[in-house]
């Protein structure tokens, strides 16, 4: 991979990850005793708000769980805010593998995915389908 593509969105090891909280967190304002005993976003009055499960090793082996977890988590939050309206939100972990440079098919840092999302956004899966491999050549400016 060319150097110009290798640093696309990557956080320097010297740069400290900062907290990106912009609103009060639930534990700061909720009374824990008022919470229900159980809660499952897969079944809220018959509605499943969570994104579908994916296999990071299809079509080939790729250790990209570090990209799949955060993109699914963010997509779930979008589906919840949108009250699961169609179309379902599915964010592209392949863009993260291609651009974020906080990892590859050999592993990575999920915390950097959230920083990348905050700085650049993450497009939907239709922008860059998951191919389970490191890019041979890919320009992140193609998707932004």
Roles of regions detected by a PLM:
Residues 1-144:
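Catalytic-core signature of thiol
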